[in-house]
Amino acid sequence: SGCRLMQEDALDVFITELLPLATLLTPNIPEAEILANRKIENVEDIKAAAAAICKLGCRYVLIKGGHFDGAEKVDYLFEDGKLKTSYRGISVNTRNTHGTGCTLSSAITSYLAREMDMNTAIAMAKTYLSGAILAGKDMKIGEGNGPVNHFYEPKSLFTKS
């Protein structure tokens, strides 16, 4: 939704106590700007921000590029501060984007729990999220940003691949 969910005084505790315990952090551009304490306007800025975030103790950082303009959206995976790969996706014209960040990180976690490597887990999670966004793009639920359709293909959630 774009709303800040953490109070300012909690940020230091998050950075010093929780972030070093994480295997993967999945900030969007505004969140990465806060964590890296720098403005992000291009790919070079993303690289510098990811290096700064990794220095805080997190091995993997997936900076999500959904806030950049354009028809194609690119997410960047860094391992130990170095660009490992990028993931390209399309922009979907919808107001139903509430929870996309949480859905992506939860899907990645579920694929990691199924013993997939980080790259495969992220790729599979992005495929799942894209399907959920497309399946829910025209739903009308409540006011403002609506949710993605998490149950667009339930069989895929329960079968081992």
Q: Model features per residue range: what roles?
A:
Residues 4-84:
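Conserved phosphate/ATP/ADP-binding segment of small-molecule kinases
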Residues 67, 98, 150:
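Histidine-centered active-site/metal-ligand motif
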Residues 83-98:
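Short pre-catalytic strand/loop immediately N-terminal to key active-site residues, enriched for Gly-Thr
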Residues 119-161:
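Charged C-terminal helix
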Residues 31, 66-69, 90-93, 126-129:
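Glycine-rich beta-alpha junction loops
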